[in-house]
Amino acid sequence: DIYEGTWDEEEIRGKGKLTDKKGNVYIGDFIDQKFSGEKGTLSLINGDIYTGKFINGQAEGLGEYIYKKGDKYIGNFSNNKREGHGIYIWASGDKFEGEFEKSFMKSGKFMYYNGDICEGNYKNEKLDGLGTFDYKNGDKYVGNFLLGKKEGKGIFTFSNGDIYEGNYRNDFKDNGKFIFSNGDIYIGNYKDNKIEGLGEYTYKN
């Protein structure tokens, strides 16, 4: 390792620059020979760069992490992991703002680059449990999700005024009530998102 900076009784302490054997470079404050301070910068050999607070050699507290691939995270860290409130921006333009746990999205709002917005709880980086999905075209879904797919009870409101209220299975309508904007009502089964099987259709007239 190569260190340039201040010393205290033969220990690295104060401001300095440390380049380790792998080529990672840290510039900032040191306490007891470890990265510690309100603002330091760690440039990793893989191209990633972290700037923020360090405690005992780890990212802890507010910071910004820029990935070589173009993604960026701004928010709280704990033990080198994304923890608590933060904003993650993908190189694609997608953006998530909310709570993180052990670097994974836990709850919050996901804004897609195409204008779609979803909000709720997450599991394995996918919507899970109660949530909402607002589509750019004006459609909206409010209901249950299972690993990113509509599953269980939910209400889908179409931009043209149609409303579906019922059950979903694997992201598709399964059984429920469809209220058409013209006043017609269908109650029954579906297959591949289309009316099929047992059901009752009531015409407004």
Model regions and ranges:
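Glycine/tyrosine- and acidic-biased, solvent-exposed loop/turn segments at the edges of beta-strands
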Residues: D1-N205
